């Protein structure tokens, strides 16, 4: 369940100014292929290629051009990036704009990832995944195609993927000062003990849980707490405890989209490739997707990813995936997950919703793919492989078992009769209110998203005037956004709490009831607090009386 705190109007105004001042969108515009020309000392480049596991940064001059700008930047850090791609002939690179010039960024970005996509003859699979995640409102990296030149030579068509770091956090979260962990294999979120040090990197110097912000404090206590709750909490208190520290709806959407795109290089199958961000202002974790070149029919395990069971996704080692298992074992979460899958299958994922986007990107990148010699070096992919990767007919070459359109059509058809609902009580999975810090005369506008497999028939705000134990009821109305790809907008209910008056403290919660009369109250773990500034009206009256 997501509880989003909305700032007062004057803070919202400041925040909106900051958003509009962020020019990073110009780096991720799909209207043309960007061009980056990197000039580096040839001896440095040779050293980088001779030491592929090194993360040493070397100075380079970068000329970056697209529809919006044409600029040259000196003293940019340059190195290889990635895991298995380091040994590929078509390598992936990282540009670091503030390593040699501290504090510098480039159109709001301190770092840019240039991914070679050596596994993918289409050079588009990960880009399509990022676009789908953005369509459904999951906070994730932006991506665009880019032509890479090094010392005058064309190194091929790449995908520029937004780096997840403190700049990413600042663009996407109200409070960007929290701990961010990069989670790589074998990041299975299993319990190792109560001591936060039990979760310090233990497989190697960085894996599986690598703290990427606030490294000086090196505090793993929040992560240890989350993992303990996932693994040690009894079933009867599991939802209350988990929702108090974690945005459950985010990981359910992540699971649903991964199942649809065949994204197996993830937590559920491979205990790999995700970020966890602890946002301090709400003391809760966010789930951030990562790395999607292995999708849409790319397979190394002889598994038909168009036909996997969405409730029992394959697990490479047969080991525990406690988070996924416990979410699927809880009927409310299982039904919400099924609802997300059904909504995406009806409103987002079928080709009718995004085939034109695929066609546009294909036409845009074809000339650059045609002259990309490096894309042929690792697996011998030809231009025909590039073209057939977009086919709705059967295509197969080595680890690429399906064309993209073929995969999508088969995956959609595979869900016929598969989704099942348990009839669990309804759930409220998103709560938004504004203003967060109301003035005495402000009404508080509440928006929630709720789902029940037996329909949601009644939603009521329960408002408590502190310290009075009784509540006042304010009804909410079903108010969905038509033709939206955001499931939470389709499940939207709205209501209003009248002005509280001066110096008041109150609390509210949401009561939701389905067509079978099953009811529940959210948030489960605590009511939401509202406060207004000033002196309470009754105290003011007494003071005035005494003054007379």
Task: Give names to the regions the model predicted.
Residues 459-502, 515-519:
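Aromatic- and glycine-rich beta-strand/loop motifs that create alpha-glucan
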Residues 24-26, 31-35, 44-46, 72-76, ...:
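Middle-to-C-terminal accessory/interaction subdomains
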Residues 437-439, 446-455, 465-467, 512-514:
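Extracellular acidic, Ser/Thr/Pro-rich low-complexity tracts
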Residues 22-128, 448-452:
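Conserved NTP-binding catalytic cores of kinases and kinase-like/nucleotidyltransferase enzymes
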Residues 58, 504-508:
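Exposed beta-strand face motif in extracellular beta-rich ectodomains
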Residues 531-548:
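A structural motif detector for short, solvent-exposed N-terminal "entry" segments of globular domains
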Residues 8-16:
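Bacterial N-terminal signal peptides
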Residues 94-102, 109, 116-117, 136-141, ...:
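Internal "kinase-insert"/substrate-recognition segments embedded within catalytic cores
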């Amino acid at each position: 369940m997501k509880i989003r705190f909305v700032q007062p109007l004057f803070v919202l105004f400041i925040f909106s100014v900051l958003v509009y001042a962020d020019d990073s969108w110009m780096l991720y515009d799909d209207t043309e292929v960007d061009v980056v020309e990197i000039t580096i000392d040839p001896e440095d480049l040779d050293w980088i290629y001779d030491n592929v596991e090194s993360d040493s940064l070397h100075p380079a001059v970068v000329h970056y051009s697209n529809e919006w700008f044409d600029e040259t930047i000196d003293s940019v850090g340059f190195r290889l990036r990635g895991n298995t791609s380091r040994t590929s002939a078509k390598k992936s690179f990282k540009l670091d704009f503030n390593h040699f010039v501290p504090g510098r960024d480039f159109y709001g970005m301190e770092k840019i990832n240039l991914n070679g996509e050596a596994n993918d003859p289409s050079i588009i699979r990960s880009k399509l995944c990022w676009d789908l995640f953005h369509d459904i409102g999951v906070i994730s990296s932006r991506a665009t195609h880019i032509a890479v030149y090094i010392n005058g030579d064309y190194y091929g068509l790449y995908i520029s993927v937004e780096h997840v770091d403190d700049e990413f956090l600042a663009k996407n979260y109200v409070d960007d000062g929290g701990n961010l962990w990069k989670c790589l294999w074998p990041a299975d979120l299993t319990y190792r003990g109560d001591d936060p040090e039990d979760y310090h990197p233990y497989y190697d110097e960085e894996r599986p849980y690598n703290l990427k912000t606030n490294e000086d404090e090196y505090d793993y206590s929040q992560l240890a707490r989350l993992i303990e709750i996932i693994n040690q909490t009894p079933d009867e208190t599991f939802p209350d405890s988990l929702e108090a520290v974690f945005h459950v709806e985010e990981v359910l959407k992540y699971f649903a989209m991964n199942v649809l795109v065949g994204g197996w290089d993830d937590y559920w199958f491979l205990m790999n490739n995700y970020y966890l961000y602890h946002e301090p202002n709400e003391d809760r974790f966010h789930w951030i997707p990562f790395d999607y070149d292995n999708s849409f029919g790319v397979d190394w395990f002889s598994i038909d990813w168009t036909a996997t069971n969405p409730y029992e996704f394959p697990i490479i080692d047969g080991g525990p995936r406690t988070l996924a298992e416990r979410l699927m074992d809880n009927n409310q979460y299982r039904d919400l997950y099924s609802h997300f899958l059904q909504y995406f299958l009806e409103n987002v994922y079928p080709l009718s919703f995004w085939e034109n986007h695929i066609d546009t990107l294909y036409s845009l990148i074809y000339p650059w793919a045609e002259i990309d010699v490096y894309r042929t070096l690792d697996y011998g992919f030809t231009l025909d492989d590039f073209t057939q990767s977009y086919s709705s007919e059967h295509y197969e070459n080595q680890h690429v078992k399906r064309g993209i359109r073929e995969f999508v059509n088969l995956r959609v058809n595979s869900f016929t009769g598969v989704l099942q609902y348990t009839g669990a009580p309804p759930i409220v999975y998103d709560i938004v209110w504004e203003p967060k810090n109301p003035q005495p005369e402000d009404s508080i506008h509440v928006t929630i998203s709720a789902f029940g497999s037996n329909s949601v028939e009644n939603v009521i705000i329960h408002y408590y005037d502190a310290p009075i134990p009784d509540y006042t009821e304010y009804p909410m109305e079903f108010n969905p956004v038509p033709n939206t790809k955001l499931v939470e907008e389709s499940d939207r209910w709205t209501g209003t709490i009248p002005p509280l008056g001066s110096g008041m403290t109150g609390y509210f919660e949401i009561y939701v009831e389905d067509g079978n009369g099953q009811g529940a109250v959210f948030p489960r773990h605590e009511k939401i607090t509202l406060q207004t500034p000033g002196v309470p009206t009754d105290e003011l009256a007494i003071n005035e009386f005494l003054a007379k």
